[in-house]
């Protein structure tokens, strides 16, 4: 009995020593590397048969290659339209022909149709904007026109977005990154006036967009310099400019405002002045021991080229 008690105490002491020994607490771990089959995604051959797009996608997923989901939808913007509804066709020379002639009678009939359509559109606009009138709107449109061009000369894109639509913005700023624009409004030769109003429905019934065409005849000065400071287009002398500017507003939007949407260029308008392109003319090879004054250089005038769309 005493021997068994001593044996039990010895075993208990060894067990306690094994528990308190940190070296014996960590049991040996045997790590055996096992090699598994590694699958690679191999694209099918060019002339392989019975290989559909679904089969290739399933094999790619089995190999662990996840193809991103590509949507074929194009984002659209409903804050403005993508064009001009029924663009106003100004008479040639902006003059009225005699009603006794055939062309004058046709012009008069066309004007009556446009006036009737404009009156119906004005009624729709006044349902959403009670302060809209054809007498006060031209002055507001001219102020908006001047402010938009002043922001263009200062390259204030944040303010310009509030004055022009998303369709007009890229047309105004395209190609002007390395150019310097100087524009100024001198005076109005004739008071601006509304020549056409359109308010059609788009996408769904009741979604109205209003477009007002304003005739502006004024004096402006425009000069465009390239990045080297050379004059590309225009001059500092004021010129008479006759423009038909279109302003648009999303009538359903309670926070919508009138913004400049585009310009109508008549077919009889004179062509624009070509922009002088700055090019590098290769000169003659100069000997290091030769003076520049000894070389006769031929001066050539730059050729005017059409450099706009």
UniProtKB/Swiss-Prot annotation:
| Cited SMART domains | Tim44
One of the record's GO molecular function terms: structural constituent of ribosome
Alphabetical UniProt keywords: Mitochondrion, Ribonucleoprotein, Ribosomal protein, Transit peptide
Q: Name one GO biological process term.
A: mitochondrial translation
**Is Cell membrane one of the keywords?**
no
Q: What is the superkingdom listed in this entry's lineage?
A: Eukaryota
Q: What does this protein do?
A: Component of the mitochondrial large ribosomal subunit (mt-LSU). Within the mitochondrial ribosomes, required to direct the nascent polypeptide toward the tunnel exit and position the exit at a distance from the membrane surface.
Summarize subunit and interaction data from the UniProt record for this chain: Component of the mitochondrial ribosome large subunit (39S) which comprises a 16S rRNA and about 50 distinct proteins.
Similarity-based family:
Belongs to the mitochondrion-specific ribosomal protein mL45 family.
This one is known as Large ribosomal subunit protein mL45
Q: What is the scientific name of the source organism?
A: Xenopus tropicalis
The gene name reads mrpl45
